[in-house]
UniProtKB/Swiss-Prot annotation:
SUPFAM superfamilies: NusB-like (SSF48013). Belongs to the NusB family. The gene is nusB. This is Transcription antitermination protein NusB. It comes from Nitratidesulfovibrio vulgaris (strain DSM 19637 / Miyazaki F) (Desulfovibrio vulgaris). Keywords: RNA-binding, Transcription, Transcription antitermination, Transcription regulation. GO terms for molecular function: RNA binding. PANTHER family: ANTITERMINATION NUSB DOMAIN-CONTAINING PROTEIN, N UTILIZATION SUBSTANCE PROTEIN B-RELATED.
């Protein structure tokens, strides 16, 4: 039986998604195959796959799965829309000028707010702020909180919705 360990938490899955997406901010994936390769190359995913192979040597290779992959794939597919939303709520900051850590965390949280009905806006905000403590600097939290608070209010009021909906 594959992977008998504990199921990863949403927070650990978000951290994995952050790490993969942050890496992609330096070398963007131009195809879904490249995105899958970046995900598979992540040390956490490679470790999981090694554990799975030990547990079941006959198991066929499976497609990426889990919350981290859903977030990575979702952010990758909707990045232009996410950047437009972030830009619209960041006063005097173009996304091109934002730090990669902050922008990656903003993309993840805005993706969750817009496209994940199972994630309340306040949870997406809190998780981004918690991850900023781990990966960002002292100024990251305030910057991220300010933008995400405005995005959350716009989503809750219906002023910001996913395109095509």
């Amino acid at each position: 039986m594959a992977n008998q360990g504990k199921k990863p938490t949403r927070r650990s899955e978000r951290a994995l998604a952050f790490q993969v997406l942050y890496g992609l901010s330096f070398t963007p994936a131009t195809s879904e195959g490249a995105l899958r390769a970046a995900y598979a190359a992540s040390p956490d995913v490679a470790d999981r796959n090694a554990e799975d192979e030990k547990a079941d040597r006959q198991a066929p290779a499976t497609a990426p799965q889990g919350y981290a992959w859903e977030v990575i794939h979702g952010v990758w597919k909707t990045q232009a829309e996410l950047d437009e939303a972030v830009s619209g709520f960041s006063q005097n900051w173009r996304v091109e000028r934002m730090g990669r850590v902050e922008l990656t965390l903003l993309r993840i949280a805005v993706y969750e707010m817009l496209f994940r009905d199972d994630v309340p806006a306040k949870v997406a905000m809190n998780e981004a702020i918690e991850l900023s403590k781990q990966f960002g600097d002292d100024n990251s939290r305030g910057f991220i909180n300010g933008i995400l608070d405005a995005v959350a209010r716009a989503v809750e009021s219906g002023r910001l919705t996913p395109k095509g909906q």
